[in-house]
Amino acid sequence: MATEVEKTESTPPHRILSIDALRGFDMFWIIGGGSFFEVLLGLTGWSIAPSLTTQLEHVEWEGFRFYDLIFPMFLFLVGCVLPYSLDKHRNSPKAVYVRILRRTLTLVLLGLVCNGLLDFHFSELRVAGVLQRIGICYGLAALICVHVGVRGQVMALISILLGYWAIMAWIPVPGGVAGDFTPQGNLCGYLDRNFLPGKIKKEYYGFGDNEGLLSTLPAVGTVLLGSLAGAWLKSGARPWWKVIGLAAAGLSSLALGQAWGMAFPIIKDRKSVV
């Protein structure tokens, strides 16, 4: 009879196929799936092809298209695996904190290297970036998940979203007016221009950085939303109840987001939608 150690070593780690499938779908678009589909649609000659191709481009400011959801989806997936990855080290608090810190610093450092850190032209260095945001959001959301349960995570998510909305809607920039969501007048851009180290480059929004300081808050909310979905998947609920629960939560979130968007415009660069 195999020993417990032998069983542990021979048993492959449990994979959540739904998370793996969604991650693969997301990575397909990240690595250039849009270009493939643009060519494919161009060959079809369909009358609807131009409209579909438009969905493979980022919206300039307000609103969103399909391509604007790819990076938020990745942050959501980062959150989905938190209930599984953190549980492995629940009995060793030190190991949990070391894991979180190591992953956060690794992602931030890799992002800086991708932005040209090793060129040592620090005045031209873009400090913000996609990997940096993933690392910081992972770190902050993971710390929240370590210290509070599902109810605490729900409260943290609500507090983050309402707090971000209140800050953006009620605090004006110097010389401006409260609730200005234009590219030039919003609070996120002002804080980036005045407090974000490094260079703010035109191709990353220009009046601020689309991965800047204040907009990190709702991005953390996206990771927490994923963590709640992961906790539901990890629960003892029956498979069909999990499907129904996720579908109901998704539809409710769409309706709530659409309604909230009437007062708080959906702007992907400012992360005013989770």
Where are these regions (language model features)?
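Conserved small/polar residues in nucleotide/adenosyl-binding loops
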Residues: V273-V274
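N-terminal signal-anchor module of multipass membrane proteins
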Residues: A2-N91, A95-V96
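Aromatic-anchored segments of alpha-helical transmembrane domains
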Residues: G32-S35, V108-L117, L161-W170, G250-G261
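A conserved active-site cap/scaffold subdomain adjacent to cofactor or substrate pockets
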Residues: F207-L256
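Long hydrophobic alpha-helical segments that form multi-pass transmembrane helix bundles
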Residues: V150-G221
